[in-house]
């Protein structure tokens, strides 16, 4: 009786964790579509700040660099998620293999978040000082909307 209950609890916990990881990955893909290189933050920046040609050129280069970096990290995230799925398929309970695969997913997701923030601040540095306040407002507004 106790073993069966413990097993059900373990499986339920594992399924819940897997659903959480999958939801996080879906969120990453929805917010970082590879088909559209410009994020909504990028578009809002163009609407809020009158960029000159030099700023546009600088930001476009930074955007291209970030797109390549983001794709590399997203590839690692997909691979890590695949490892997690394989680990669970081999042994559908919390195990050292599932733990390690979960940590790989977490590392890749954290790397993506960090790279995105570095990119945001690199973009800001590419603006004229008089345009940075408007950029900051757009950034803060976007983050606030995302947290609601």
UniProtKB/Swiss-Prot annotation:
Signal sequence range: none
GO BP field: response to cadmium ion
Coiled-coil annotated residue ranges, if any: none
Keywords: Cadmium, Cadmium resistance, Cobalt, Nickel, Plasmid
UniProt cross-references to InterPro entries, sorted A to Z: Metal_resist
Source species, domain of life: Bacteria
Entry keyword Acetylation: no
Pfam families: Metal_resist
Keyword Kinase on entry: no
Annotated function: Component of the NCC cation-efflux system that confers resistance to nickel, cobalt and cadmium. May be involved in the regulation of NCC.
Family membership noted in the UniProt record: To A.eutrophus CnrR.
Protein's recorded name: Nickel-cobalt-cadmium resistance protein NccX
Name of the gene this protein is made from: nccX
């Amino acid at each position: 009786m106790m073993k069966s209950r413990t097993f059900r609890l373990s499986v339920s916990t594992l399924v819940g964790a897997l659903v959480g990881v999958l939801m996080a990955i879906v969120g990453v893909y929805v917010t970082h579509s590879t088909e559209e290189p410009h994020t909504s933050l990028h578009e809002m920046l163009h609407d809020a700040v009158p960029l000159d040609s030099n700023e546009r050129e600088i930001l476009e280069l930074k955007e291209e660099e970030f797109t390549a970096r983001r794709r590399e990290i997203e590839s690692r995230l997909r691979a890590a998620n695949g490892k997690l799925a394989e680990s669970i398929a081999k042994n559908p309970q919390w195990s050292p293999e599932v733990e390690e695969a979960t940590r790989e997913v977490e590392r890749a997701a954290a790397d993506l978040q960090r790279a995105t923030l570095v990119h945001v601040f690199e973009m800001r540095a590419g603006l004229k000082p008089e345009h940075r306040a408007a950029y900051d407002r757009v950034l803060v507004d976007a983050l606030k909307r995302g947290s609601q």
